[in-house]
Amino acid sequence: MKTQFVILIVAVVLLQLISHSEAFLGALWNVAKSVFGKRGLRNFDDLDDTFEPEMSEADLKYLQDLLR
């Protein structure tokens, strides 16, 4: 009876460790997807046009009005 109880406790502890690590890895995966996904990288590309040297002040003002 003692052996069965110890095996049960060890199994419960191991299952909790697995479930917590799965949640942690899932959270890391979601962060990686949001940073490197299409929508995450799109936000980094929005300001590339404002640093182009060939743009005039009117172009910059128009872009700023569009992004508001």
Swiss-Prot record:
Phenotype when changing residue 30 to E: Increase, decrease or no change in antibacterial and antifungal activities, depending on the strains tested, and increase in hemolytic activity. Decrease in antibacterial and antifungal activities, and increase in hemolytic activity
UniProt-reported outcome of changing residue 26 to R: Decrease in antibacterial activity against the antibiotic-resistant bacterium S.aureus, and important increase in absence of antibacterial activity against both antibiotic-resistant bacteria E.cloacae and P.aeruginosa, as well as in increase in hemolytic activity
Outcome when changing residue 24 to K: Decrease in antibacterial activity, increase in antifungal activity and decrease in hemolytic activity. Important decrease or loss in antibacterial, antifungal and hemolytic activities
Keyword set includes Nucleotide-binding: no
Modified residues (Phenylalanine amide): 36
Result when mutating residue 32 to F/L: No change in antibacterial activity against the antibiotic-resistant bacterieum S.aureus, E.cloacae and P.aeruginosa, as well as in increase in hemolytic activity
Propeptide intervals in chain numbering: 40-68
Sorted UniProt keywords: Amidation, Antibiotic, Antimicrobial, Cleavage on pair of basic residues, Cytolysis, Hemolysis, Membrane, Secreted, Signal, Target cell membrane, Target membrane
GO CC terms: extracellular region; membrane; other organism cell membrane
Expressing tissues: Expressed by the venom gland.
Main location: secreted
Effect ascribed to mutating residue 32 to W: No change or increase in antibacterial activities, no change or decrease in antifungal activities, and increase in hemolytic activity. Decrease in antibacterial and antifungal activities, and increase in hemolytic activity
Location in or out of the cell: Secreted; Target cell membrane
Keyword Lipid metabolism attributed: no
Effect of residue 31 to P: Loss in antibacterial activity against the antibiotic-resistant bacterium S.aureus, and no change in absence of antibacterial activity against both antibiotic-resistant bacteria E.cloacae and P.aeruginosa, as well as loss in hemolytic activity
GO biological-process terms attached to the record: defense response to bacterium; killing of cells of another organism
Outcome reported for the amino acid change (mutating residue 35 to L): No change in antibacterial activity against the antibiotic-resistant bacterium S.aureus, E.cloacae and P.aeruginosa, as well as in increase in hemolytic activity
Residues making up the signal peptide according to the UniProt record: 1-23
UniProt effect for mutating residue 34 to K: Increase in antibacterial and antifungal activities on almost all strains tested, and increase in hemolytic activity. No change or increase in antibacterial, antifungal and hemolytic activities
Record site feature (Important for activity), residues: 29
Annotated function: Cationic amphipathic peptide with antibacterial activities against both Gram-positive and Gram-negative bacteria. Also shows antifungal activities. Is mildly hemolytic against human erythrocytes. In addition, when tested in vitro on the parasite Trypanosoma cruzi (responsible of the Chagas disease), is able to reduce the number of the three forms (epimastigote, trypomastigote and amastigote). Also shows antiplasmodial and cytotoxic activity (tested on Plasmodium gallinaceum, and MCF-7 breast cancer cell line).
Family named by the database record: Belongs to the non-disulfide-bridged peptide (NDBP) superfamily. Short antimicrobial peptide (group 4) family.
Annotated protein name in UniProt: Amphipathic peptide VmCT1
